[in-house]
């Protein structure tokens, strides 16, 4: 019953992927044993990809047809304090990341590690994807275009009826399948749990081809896990600001910015990147007044003028 329910969605989901990412699409008959997967996880300073930063990024590259795997793991200097209540969750504090490499270096290395041919996976993928995307855009890197599998969605679709855990948290699922450990909320440990969870879920279905993953709706191109703003529907003044800011980023020029936050303020900034997050556009810029990086929501910019 479950397998037939899943596979009844194959045709529509394959059609969707062909339309939305024709260059990425793998045919439904692609054997899972021929795919390279990368399970990955991020640990952060908080929940907002705009206001917060990545403090650890890890991944496990593997194939179902082989017992060996390769790992990537690095702490990241977030350039901001890690709140105490967040450190209590993942155990990473300011002292641990003080001498860690920058986000630019770690994100570039991670891009090299995953390559363009792998299928990425994460548990609650939208969270991890958004942080990686925003961090990469913030430092001028192009986010990957790989397909991404959400192991949370996959588990929710497959583990139905009587075969259903108390909840779908990664820790609960790891213990449900008998591979739970002592360490959680560290990026490498959680990446390994995601890898093992995926293998268990594949065993349940007995699927050997990519079509099952397509059918569940748990597989999307990287960029589609994050809500993108429709630039064409932006107000005219926002589009004008966007054009000017993109020009300033290219020329590495400065901009005099009037911004409506809690209070209206005017400052000179050096634009670094325009970032999309949760359906809104943001400017990441170096503020000469505060002498630090700041983020501004584009629709709250009152005026933007090139500053000589």
For the regions a language model picked out, list residue spans one by one.
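Conserved non-catalytic scaffold segment of RNase H-like nuclease domains
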Residues: 6-145, 160, 170-181
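Acidic two-metal-ion nuclease catalytic site recognized across multiple nuclease folds
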Residues: 6-29, 197-256
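Residues immediately flanking
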Residues: 42, 124, 151, 271, ...
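Short, glycine/acidic-enriched loop or turn micro-motifs at the edges of active sites
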Residues: 44-46, 153, 193
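Acidic, Mg2+-coordinating catalytic module of metal-dependent nucleases/exonucleases
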Residues: 117-136, 162-164, 168-227
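Short alpha-helix plus adjacent loop in nuclease-associated cores
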Residues: 149-165
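Core beta-strand-centered patch of the WYL/Sm-like small regulatory domain
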Residues: 232-308
């Amino acid at each position: 019953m479950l397998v037939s329910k899943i596979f009844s969605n194959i045709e529509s989901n394959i059609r969707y992927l062909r339309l939305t990412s024709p260059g990425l699409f793998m045919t439904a008959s692609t054997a899972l044993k021929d795919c390279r997967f990368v399970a990955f996880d991020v640990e952060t300073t908080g929940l907002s990809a705009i206001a917060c930063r990545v403090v650890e990024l890890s991944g496990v590259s593997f194939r179902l047809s082989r017992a060996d795997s390769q790992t990537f793991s690095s702490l990241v200097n977030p350039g901001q304090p890690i709140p105490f209540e967040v450190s209590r969750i993942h155990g990473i504090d300011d002292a641990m990341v003080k001498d860690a490499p920058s986000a630019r270096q770690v994100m570039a290395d991670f891009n090299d590690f995953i390559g363009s041919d792998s299928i990425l996976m994460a548990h609650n993928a939208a969270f991890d994807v958004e942080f990686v995307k925003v961090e990469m855009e913030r430092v001028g890197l192009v986010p990957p275009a790989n397909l991404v599998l959400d192991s949370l969605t996959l588990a929710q679709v497959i583990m139905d009826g009587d075969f259903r855990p108390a909840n779908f948290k990664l820790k609960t699922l790891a213990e449900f399948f008998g591979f739970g450990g002592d360490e959680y909320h560290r990026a490498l440990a959680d990446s390994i749990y995601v890898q093992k969870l995926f293998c268990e879920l594949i065993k349940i279905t007995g699927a050997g081809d990519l079509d099952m993953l397509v059918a569940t709706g748990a597989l999307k191109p990287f960029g589609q896990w994050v809500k993108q703003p429709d630039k064409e529907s932006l107000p005219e003044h926002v589009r004008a600001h966007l054009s000017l800011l993109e020009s300033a980023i290219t020329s590495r020029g400065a901009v005099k910015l009037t911004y409506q936050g809690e209070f209206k303020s005017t400052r000179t900034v050096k634009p670094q990147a325009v970032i999309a997050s949760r359906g809104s556009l943001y400017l990441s810029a170096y503020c000469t007044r505060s002498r630090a990086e700041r983020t501004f929501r584009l629709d709250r910019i009152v005026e933007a003028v090139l500053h000589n």
